């Protein structure tokens, strides 16, 4: 049997999508650990994205067709800890220039490539790009969908060295280091686009 599309025919409800845009109230945080011979003397750092954008296209009847893109401005990442303000400025400057090289790499991106729904959880295979290097990362995303807002939370860990980044070293002879593994916590709040 041959099916011929009819111009102007209504599209199947299963293909109808709802588009959500990330709100500034969303929270994107990076947590670092410490390593090295004198790692005990170092600090774990909490880094917050102050500028980001993102879009979620959700297909309620076919969640596996849904997709998401998130972009984080690297020059708007800000170190929140340790509590010493002078130290925060110093660590933020080192992160932007020595670690992320924001002059050459202005964004970090996360883009879904496959989605599988299980209850209120989505298993997402995503492409994560940092410093022009891309790796696939598996995500488990908890999703709550209200009438006008989607909320999604996930946590994932990547190794800086996978993206050509040498973890920051400081202290006497580089004996205090940031650990290679960094953890991203995302709490996305996304209003429905009209």
Kindly give the residue locations of the regions a language model identified:
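Low-complexity, acidic/polar, glycine-enriched regions of mature
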Residues: 9-194
């Amino acid at each position: 049997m041959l099916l011929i599309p009819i111009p102007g025919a209504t599209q199947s409800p299963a293909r109808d999508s709802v588009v959500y845009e990330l709100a500034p109230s969303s929270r994107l945080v990076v947590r670092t650990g410490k390593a090295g011979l004198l790692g005990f003397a170092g600090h774990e750092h909490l880094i917050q994205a102050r500028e980001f954008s993102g879009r979620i296209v959700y297909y309620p009847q076919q969640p596996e067709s849904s997709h998401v893109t998130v972009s984080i401005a690297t020059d708007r990442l800000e170190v929140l800890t340790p509590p010493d303000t002078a130290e925060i400025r110093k660590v933020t400057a080192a992160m932007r220039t020595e670690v992320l090289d924001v002059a050459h790499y202005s964004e970090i991106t996360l883009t879904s490539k496959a989605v599988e729904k299980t209850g209120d959880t989505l298993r997402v295979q995503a492409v994560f790009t940092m410093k022009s290097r891309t790796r696939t990362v598996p995500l488990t995303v908890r999703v709550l969908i209200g009438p006008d807002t989607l909320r999604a939370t996930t946590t994932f860990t990547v190794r800086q060295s996978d993206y050509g980044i040498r973890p920051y070293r400081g202290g006497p002879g580089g004996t205090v280091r940031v650990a290679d593994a960094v953890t991203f916590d995302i709490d996305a709040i996304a209003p429905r686009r009209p």
